[in-house]
């Protein structure tokens, strides 16, 4: 799909090109109380009051997300007009904009429209410019057009005809909007990879498959990939990671992916993604109902790989290292048992009280491994706890960090990217729940504050660098009729790296 940017100040009569240029449809916003947006006012004049008449007749009340096609419109180059309700003008925010953009794309994708002129990006949204509107609109469109068909014997072809979108933007934002469009496409491509990996079944997306995906990313985008096998992992003394992997016939992999966009001496940001390609719970077996969704337990790994693809396509001037410990968590005659004690790469001994708290066991060795890169920051991403889902639901990812500056950067990125996160506590008092009578630390801390104690466990392995943990158990995928991976938190991670790179 082709995206292009054209500057236009509708209030200064600069709209001639949009009024006369050929297009299948022009998208206009209408607020409640019959208020027309700037572009809608110009189109209304050119069509001799058509928009006003439609609004006054009550056919378009401006309620958020409502759409109305006006066919065979005369006086402008576009053959059709799509009116989109924006809701109340004084309540028009990021969510209202995304709702309006999504409603517009859904209406357009259900038609044979091939070329669209999109004016909503110029609407004022929380003091953001048109470039933000362009990026958000492209991501909303790509979200609507995403389909997972890899496992279908006869995939259905795309049903829409949309090929080209022309965005009208404020002239002062034109350069930034062009960059935003390129970044949005790269980001959407990264999210698509993340969603594809998550949606693949566990018998396809194995640890070896993730390793091969990393190698392909390296080949396609000029990255450097290292994929360590069982013997190399054993040589590194990653006893905690291996305690999870041991009962599966699928060999574990330890993936390290390097992107160098800055000087070699510049400290990298390290992203660590949990890669449990299927989680049965091990000996602490999960209930059968809903266990199929445990293929999504590698979404941390998928989001890290998707972010690396996006970063490489954007060409960010920053160094990034991705680390993915990946294996299955299976029961078996040689599986780790509740009460077993294992030794981590750091040397700390861990009493495994519950084998279904395995994510932290593979992440802790990866976090220790990250020390060798002398990182500027380390962010781990994991579908770590059901407790985080109970606490935050499916809207906010849980953000844990003792570093206020790093946490602030990530929260700013989450707001800019419309990829919500909420900072959770990480007080030292919670560490007491992880005490063990027999080892240095237990892998669970009981039912109270389960998401917090999981993060506290990880914090024991991150003392040498700035660190943050994102628990995406509630945001990485959706259940029910809309079941599927979401691609989150790729937007948050990518925006954080864009900000760090100053781009």
UniProtKB/Swiss-Prot annotation:
Family statement drawn from the similarity comment of this UniProt entry: Belongs to the peptidase M17 family.
Cofactor annotation = Mn(2+)
Q: Which residues form the active site?
A: 286, 360
Q: Where does Mn(2+) 2 bind?
A: 274, 279, 297, 358
Chief subcellular location = cytoplasm
Q: Which organism is it from?
A: Burkholderia vietnamiensis (strain G4 / LMG 22486) (Burkholderia cepacia (strain R1808))
**Its gene?**
pepA
Question: Which subcellular locations apply to this protein?
Answer: Cytoplasm
- This chain's protein is named Probable cytosol aminopeptidase
